Amino acid sequence: LPSFLYAEMVGYNIL
């Protein structure tokens, strides 16, 4: 997965 996509998914999981 692209780094930005992974970061987005992780960010949403934190929220």
UniProtKB/Swiss-Prot annotation:
Disulfide bonds: none annotated. One of its GO terms (cellular component) is extracellular region. Keywords: Hydrolase, Secreted. It is an enzyme of class 3 (hydrolase). Found in milt (at protein level). Its EC number is 3.4.22.-. It comes from the Eukaryota. It is found in: Secreted. GO terms for molecular function: hydrolase activity. Cysteine proteinase that hydrolyzes basic proteins, such as histones, salmine and clupeine but not milk casein. Shows a preference for basic residues at P2 and P1 positions. This is Miltpain.
